[in-house]
Each structure stands twice: as C-alpha cells, then as structure tokens.
C-alpha cells in the first residue's frame, strides 16, 4: 500500500496599520503618470522667484488588508495624507497650500524571510485649500480657493521589514493629481513624487 500526500499552501489574511511621513516633491515628475502643472511657474513670472522649494512633509496614515498564499500576497489598501505649507515670493506675495488626500487601490506583496517588497496602484480623491495674497501695483489682493481632484492616479513601490508584530515600512509613491486653479486658469500639482518612512503594526 502506498500513500500519496498533497501539500497545499495555507491561505492567511493579514492587516497592517501604518503611520509614516517623509518628503513629497510637488515639482517632481509623477513617474510614468502625466502631469501638466504650470501654476507656480506662472506666479514666479508675476511675483518673482519662489523662496522655498516645492517640497512638503505629508503625514500619512494607512490601512492594508491582504490575503497570502505561500510567499505571494495581494490585497487592498487605503491611505489618508495631509500637508500644509506657506510659500513666499520675492515681491512679498504669499501662497498657503493645504491638501487632504485619500488614496486607495490594490497592493501585491512578496513575503520574503526578512522583508516584504510590494507594489501598489490605484486612485482616490484630493481636496485642497489655497489662500493667495498677491501684490500688484502696490495693492494687495487676497483670495481663498477650494478645489477637488476626483480621479488622481498613483502607483508605489516599497517594502516592509517585520519586527514581530511591529515593523518598518518605506515607500516611494508617484501621484498624478492636478488641480485647476480657478483664479488663474492654471494647474497646480497636489501629487508629485514622495519618499516615505514609518512604522506599522500587523494583526
């Protein structure tokens, strides 16, 4: 009598809660995604050079749920990010930019022995508040503009390094989220390229 056994990969479900931050460059290319930002360039032509870089520091909270079969896993993720920055021009004009983004999509993991590299892509929503204080002919004009990007696109690459239930996560994201600024009929990039580091808890 001969017994034949069949080995099957056991499916497991995992969830990650993450918090991370880093640098998001609004002027950088969105990788393979298109962008048509020209708002800041137009303002520099009118109000002089921008004194700060177009880099912001977002705070990001993310939740990932995925199913693993062996060393391969796939699932769904959502991230909520927020940033705010004040920009100054050489003629004294100022611009305050505040954005709140919700990004969601699919993630794919490889579960290695010491790290879990991943790739993700998806869409979401951005809302923004722009406060303009611009000088022209010795007079100051102030305005507040609210806007929304309904279908931003993103993709990301990164890895998680598990340390028992906790771990370290780093990610590079490419986001195309161009907002039409009604006051100037120009486009401002709310996305760009971001490099993020943080911690996660798995359960």
Model features per residue range: what roles?
Residues 59-67, 102-112, 121-123, 155-163, ...:
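Residues on the lipid-exposed face of transmembrane beta-strands in outer-membrane beta-barrel proteins
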Residues 150-154:
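Trp-centered recognition loops
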Residues 16-18, 163, 190-203:
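Outer-membrane beta-barrel "beta-signal"
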Residues 27-53, 81-101, 127-149, 178-190:
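Flexible, solvent-exposed loop segments that connect beta-strands
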Residues 70-76, 114-117, 163-170:
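Repeated loop/turn-to-beta-strand initiation elements of outer-membrane beta-barrel proteins
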Residues 8-76, 85:
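Short glycine/proline- and aromatic-enriched beta-strand/turn motifs that initiate or cap beta-hairpins
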Residues 2-8:
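C-terminal segment of classical bacterial N-terminal signal peptides
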Residues 17-25, 76-82, 119-125, 170-174:
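Transmembrane beta-barrel strands of outer-membrane/channel proteins
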């Amino acid at each position: 009598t001969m017994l034949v056994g069949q080995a099957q990969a056991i499916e497991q479900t995992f969830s990650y809660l993450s918090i991370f931050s880093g640098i998001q460059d609004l002027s950088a290319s969105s990788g393979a995604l298109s962008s048509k930002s020209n708002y800041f360039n137009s303002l520099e032509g009118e109000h002089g050079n921008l004194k700060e870089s177009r880099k912001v520091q977002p705070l990001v909270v993310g939740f990932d749920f995925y199913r693993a079969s062996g060393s391969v896993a796939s699932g769904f993720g959502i991230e909520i990010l927020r940033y705010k920055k004040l920009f100054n021009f050489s003629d004294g004009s100022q611009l305050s930019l505040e954005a709140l983004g919700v990004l969601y999509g699919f993630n794919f993991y490889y579960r290695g022995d010491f790290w879990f590299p991943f790739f993700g892509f998806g869409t979401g929503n951005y809302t923004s508040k722009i406060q303009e204080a611009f000088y022209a002919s010795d007079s100051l004009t102030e305005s507040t503009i609210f806007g929304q990007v309904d279908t931003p696109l993103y993709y990301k690459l990164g890895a998680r390094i598990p340390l028992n239930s906790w771990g370290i996560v780093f990610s590079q994201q490419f986001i195309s989220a161009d907002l039409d600024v009604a006051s100037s009929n120009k486009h401002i990039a709310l996305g760009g390229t971001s490099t993020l580091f943080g911690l996660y808890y798995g359960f």
